[in-house]
């Protein structure tokens, strides 16, 4: 058995907390020697340190599968010491093209690179406008992003490994126009993790391809893999795992793609209850 789980809307409660039952599940997985792998759109630096420090956690799938990290054994919370063991980067020329598309619209522009997420300060200060009025989403975005004072194209050129791009919008017309232009580009994967965003990765970078690769790397059978998710970017891993579990609070597309649906939502220990029942 190996367990992969999305963070936001899945493992974490709606106010971005870890419940006692979820910690107890991780403790039981560690006791049994079962790997728990955060599988998230977040950068590595955006995963809560107590999760990275837990003895059940040695790997993390980040940026929607663009990077798979192995944590440092001695200091797992020091993300600068983690080793990237799989990389499916976004081509810089494509990233510049995506920026040129976005520049004509009122959207944010997140640069996920080198295990971090960078956002121009002028957009960072406006994040509340792009979160659909949800203060918990706004708080999460602010916590996982580093505001920068350099221009976007220069930052794209400066980073070592470009993982993905994210754009948050508040006018559906901007979403539709950007999506239409992205459809004309090759070499990318397009998805979303919230109703109000668009996420762009390099071709072949999905949570599903990362899950498949890590299972092979660790000698785990896909049939023994459990995956939990709630949004569109989770669908590839729900389809790849032998036990693809959509949260009961998941998008309809996830519930359609999954092998089963959890009995409880993310605010009522849906992941923990399902895994503990499977271990019983």
Role assignments for model-derived ranges:
Residues 1-7, 24-27, 31, 220:
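Non-catalytic pre-domain segments flanking phosphatase-related domains
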Residues 53-56, 63-64, 185-186, 240-241, ...:
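Short, structured coil segments at secondary-structure junctions
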Residues 7, 65, 229-231:
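Active-site metal-binding loops of divalent metal-dependent hydrolases
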Residues 1-2, 18-19, 183, 198-280:
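Mg2+-dependent phosphoryl-transfer enzymes with acidic/Ser/Thr/Gly-rich catalytic loops
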Residues 105-108, 112-228:
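Conserved acidic, metal-coordinating active-site core of Asp-based
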Residues 16-32, 88-95, 148-153, 202-216:
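Short, acidic loop-to-helix structural element flanking the phosphoryl-transfer center
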Residues 1-16, 98, 238:
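Asp-based phosphoryl-transfer active-site loop
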Residues 20-133:
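Active-site phosphate-binding/coordination module
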């Amino acid at each position: 058995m190996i367990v992969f789980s999305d963070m936001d809307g899945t493992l974490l409660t709606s106010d971005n907390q870890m419940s006692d039952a979820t910690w107890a599940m991780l403790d039981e997985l560690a006791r049994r020697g079962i790997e728990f792998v955060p599988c998230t759109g977040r950068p590595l630096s955006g995963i809560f340190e107590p999760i990275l420090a837990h003895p059940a956690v040695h790997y993390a799938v980040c940026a929607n599968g663009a990077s798979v990290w192995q944590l440092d054994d001695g200091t797992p919370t020091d993300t600068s010491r983690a080793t990237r063991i799989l990389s499916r980067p976004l081509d810089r020329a494509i990233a510049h093209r995506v920026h040129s598309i976005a520049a004509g619209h009122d959207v944010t522009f997140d640069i996920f690179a080198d295990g971090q997420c960078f956002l121009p300060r002028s957009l960072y200060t406006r994040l509340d406008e792009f979160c659909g009025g949800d203060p918990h989403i706004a708080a999460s975005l602010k916590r996982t992003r580093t505001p920068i004072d350099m221009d976007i194209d220069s930052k794209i050129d400066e980073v070592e490994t470009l993982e993905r791009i994210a754009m948050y919008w508040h006018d559906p017309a901007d979403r539709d126009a950007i999506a239409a232009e992205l459809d004309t580009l090759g070499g990318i994967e397009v998805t979303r993790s919230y109703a109000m965003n668009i996420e762009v990765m390099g071709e072949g970078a999905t949570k599903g391809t990362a899950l498949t690769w890590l299972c092979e790397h660790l000698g785990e059978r896909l049939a023994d893999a459990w995956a939990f998710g709630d949004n569109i970017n989770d669908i590839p891993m729900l389809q790849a795992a032998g036990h693809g579990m959509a949260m009961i609070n998941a998008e309809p597309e996830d519930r359609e793609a999954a092998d089963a649906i959890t009995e409880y939502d993310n605010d009522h220990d849906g992941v923990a209850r399902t895994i503990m029942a499977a271990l019983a």
